[in-house]
Each structure stands twice: as structure tokens, then as C-alpha cells.
Design a protein with these regions (language model features):
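Short flexible/disordered coil segments
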Residues: 9-14, 94-104, 155-166
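Glycine- and acidic
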Residues: 32-37, 64-65, 113-119, 148-150, ...
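Helicase-primase coupling helices
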Residues: 68-153
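Short alpha-helices
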Residues: 1, 124, 128, 144-187
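Short, low-complexity, polar/charged sequence segments that are solvent-exposed and flexible
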Residues: 53-57, 87-89, 111-115, 165-169
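Active-site phosphate/pyrophosphate-binding segments
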Residues: 1-93, 101, 181, 185-199
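Short, hydrophobic/amphipathic alpha-helical patches that form generic packing surfaces
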Residues: 18-29, 56, 81-84, 128, ...
Length: 199
């Protein structure tokens, strides 16, 4: 029922189509690395699923989108220089979400030079980091999109699963790829069975 309702939702459907169009255009311009910037650790398992979905569905016939999960903000200090100033063959997806209220920083726990952080909490700092990163991406004309989860209800995750399955299928169709099989992986299975049978 929820799936049918989503398909009837013009905003949802138009958003899927818009994202598919943009991604196919980027892939055709040789931007085939999909860097997933994850600012919400509760999405770790979901994003591993998304990575698998994208890799196994699109990676065929010498084509593909290489999904790379980047753990943020940790990777701000190790990989962001590459993202901003390295090869221009990436496009980016920001994932973030509303967090539980964290304690505010008080003046007793901070250096005077950082007084501007007083009464801010960790979520405020993280949100500022995300916004700053996106502003720099825009200035440098680096392609990106952003998903923000207001809640983590089952319904929200169901919408995300539906969105990315539909998006992946339509990208595959646009690239003239069958998204439903894994012929190369089958070769490894066959070779493994041969080795085990003959050993």
C-alpha cells in the first residue's frame, strides 16, 4: 500500500526522475564515482545496502557507478582535500539526520578563542560543517545532492528503500543494462565449485 501511494505521489516520482536524469548525465560525462558522505552513523547498514545495490545492479558491460562510502566528519580530515581538489570524476550524496539533543558547550569547558561555540551543541557544529562543505562544493561546481532524515521511523526507511531501488532500476535502463543479474559474480561461483570439486 505504501509503495503504491509513493508511486502516486507526484513530488516523490518527479524527484526520482530528476535524480535519475542528473546521474545519467554525470555518468555520460565520465563522473562515475558516487561518493556517499555519511554524517549519520545510524544509516551505516542502510548505506552498505545502497552501495551493494548500486554496484551489483549497474556494474556491467564495462559500465558502472562506483559507490564509495565516506564516514563523516572523520573523512573531512583525511579525504576532503582529494574530494575538493583531486580528479573531477566524482559526484556526491550527503546523508544526515536530526539527532537527539546533545549537551550545550559552556564557557567553563572551552578556550576563550572558541567563545563563539558557547551554547552550541555537537549537532550544531556538525550541521555547520555540512552546510560549509556544501557551500564550498557549490563554489567549486562539484556535483552533489543531499538527503536529510527528520525521523528514523520504519515508514521513512521504507521510502528511502523504495526511492533508491526505483532510481537504480531506471539508471540501469537508461544505460541499457539489466539491473537484475550478476553474470560476472556467477563466474567466480563456478570457478570456486570447480576448485572444490577437483581438490
Amino acid at each position: 500500500k505504501q509503495f503504491n501511494n509513493l508511486l502516486k505521489n507526484k513530488y516523490f516520482f518527479n524527484t526520482v526522475i530528476s535524480n535519475v536524469t542528473n546521474i545519467v548525465e554525470l555518468v555520460n560525462k565520465k563522473k562515475s564515482n558516487a561518493v556517499i558522505l555519511n554524517y549519520d552513523e545510524s544509516l551505516d547498514n542502510f548505506l552498505k545496502w545502497y552501495q551493494q545495490l548500486l554496484a551489483e545492479s549497474i556494474g556491467k558491460k564495462a559500465k558502472g557507478i562506483f559507490p564509495i562510502i565516506s564516514t563523516m566528519p572523520k573523512d573531512n580530515h583525511s579525504l576532503m582535500q582529494l574530494y575538493l581538489d583531486g580528479q573531477k570524476n566524482n559526484f556526491y550524496t550527503f546523508f544526515s539526520g536530526a539527532d537527539k539533543i546533545s549537551p550545550k558547550i559552556n564557557k567553563e569547558t572551552i578556550l576563550r578563542s572558541k567563545n563563539f561555540l558557547i551554547n552550541k551543541n555537537l549537532q550544531d557544529i556538525l550541521d555547520s560543517k555540512i552546510l560549509a562543505t556544501q557551500k564550498v562544493f557549490k563554489k567549486k561546481k562539484i556535483p552533489f545532492r543531499s538527503f536529510f532524515l527528520k525521523t528514523r521511523k520504519e515508514e521513512t526507511l521504507g521510502e528511502l528503500f523504495t526511492f533508491f531501488v526505483l532510481e537504480t532500476i531506471l539508471i540501469a535502463k537508461a544505460l541499457k543494462i539489466n539491473p537484475y543479474d550478476q553474470p560476472a559474480v556467477e563466474l567466480i561461483k563456478k570457478e570456486t565449485n570447480k576448485i572444490l570439486f577437483n581438490s
